[in-house]
Amino acid sequence: MGQMNWHTLLSDRRLEREVSSLPSFRSRVRNEFERDYDRMVFSAPFRRLQNKAQIFPLPGTIFVHNRLTHSLEVSCVGRSLGNIVTSGLRERYEALPFYDSDIANIVSAACLAHDMGNPPFGHSGERAISAFFREGAGAEWEDAVRSEGGRWEDFIRFEGNANAFRLLTHRFEGRRPGGFALTYSTLASIVKYPYSSLSAGGKNKFGYFATEEETFAEIAQHLGILRLQDSPEVYARYPLVFLVEAADDICYQIMDLEDAYKLRIISYEEVSHLFMSFLDIEEQDTSREVLRSIEDRNERVAYLRSRVINHLTEACGKAFLEYEPEIMTGEFRSPLVAVIPEAEACKAASRYAYKHIYTAQDVVDVELAGHRVFSEIIERMMHALMHPDNAYSRTFLNRVSSQYNVHEKTTYGKIQCTLDYISGMTDLYALDLYRKITGMNLPFA
């Protein structure tokens, strides 16, 4: 069996590499992976994450996490994981030049980008899009897509991770080649599922659409990512994906519990018990000692949350180093949170969240709204794309940003154009557009 090599895995080559006139400035002030991080922070799609719901509806009187705050926190945890792993690898491979910040910067940048392809209304937005094409009005276009050679599975299993890879690599109308022109290492770190929708099976998870398949293959070849299967192609995970995934798992699971407490969905006793279950006996005793000096319950929860995140971060960093040989051969495929000593506590917290948090009325209402809003917008835009000469169609398409190619010829291309447009919306923009095109909110009212 083959093995991946850190020499080739850490590469600052960029997609559609730009010609630089300031190499000395860039090498002196920022390395290439720091440029990736900064490029995303200053981008419009990243800013729009501030008005995309994580789990709970926005805005509210109690400030809970949105996609932006979540991504920033994941990036912080990812950086810490990168530092832990760098320290361990430097000891293990003394001859290799593991630069102090490269892995941490790559993981941190990838963490920033991991949710940039998600549509409005949280994960319910992904489910709403998939349901529309699988069992809703969108099913009527399946025969047309397949007869044209398109990949229908890309839509009935719509995946925000694949959409993030498209957003970062696709050349939208009027934009530069290579999308964000990020480094190959940062882009590879985003692809949690290194295969297309043809290999997704019943998991409904995949890493790239048919339109970006060649782009990922190019990146994989340059970095030396192992190919595990041909036709359809399945690759081993790029090693740093495990760190990005762990950072996301740690943050969303722990922060969802804290948000649920702030919204009074769960009690102080429940959240503190769940947080304590992640800690060993010694840490529990230390935590209780500190908690005696804290009167404010919100501050108590915040303190426990910080201890748990720190504890899980260290555990996942150690797990990566333990399983690194199997990761490098593509044999290890489990999330890091599933192989740490705290795995059972993670499972218990996840079960609790699904039973008591993700079924809360506010969360369910967001999902119901998402289904209705997406169905209406997709239907109207697809009608406009299919019949562009109609008066209503011309009016509707005039609202669409010029970066989206409304002149796509194939049905697959028209659907993808529609989903590019919708997934770039914020929650408020999607809701406002829905109200306007249905006449619920008239501009002169």
Question: How should these model regions be labeled?
Answer:
Residues 2-18, 425-445:
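Structural signal for terminal/edge beta-strands and the immediately following C-terminal loop/tail
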